[in-house]
């Protein structure tokens, strides 16, 4: 299983990563730049890391997840990823109109350096698997989130696996659940071939 570190928005955090791991970053448009920051209205322009600076320092072999906090930045993200020769990545949490737009681009190979491998669809206890799988020919990943209950049972896993889609789990602490729930989730997926998990505590997943 690949370990993707949650919310790596500074160079200090990036420097601390195992080079075999991946990272999730939060991307916003601010003062004519793409910057890494999670919370709106709390941006200190003096301390913001630009996405380009992040990419110029990116050496990890794992997947880079781009959690989009602003719309309309997708093309610039792809351009920068191409510039720095980063190919192992995907967009997360696009609004539905933009997701559909870019899913069609991916399916039709309309953008250089952008393919279904760079998109995920969401599946959770609130978001039905059937909806996510309706995009199966346009995406490479299923993002499995857990708000109140873990949705990935054997039936759901087999449906995803039959479409040759990679699974990225959301570790329970990212939704405010107790850290002990990591152990419970690990037990539930012990017989599944899970590609990745996004977590604050990769050491508890290893």
Give the residues covered by each predicted segment.
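Phosphate-group recognition and catalysis centered on beta-loop-alpha active-site segments
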Residues: 1-206
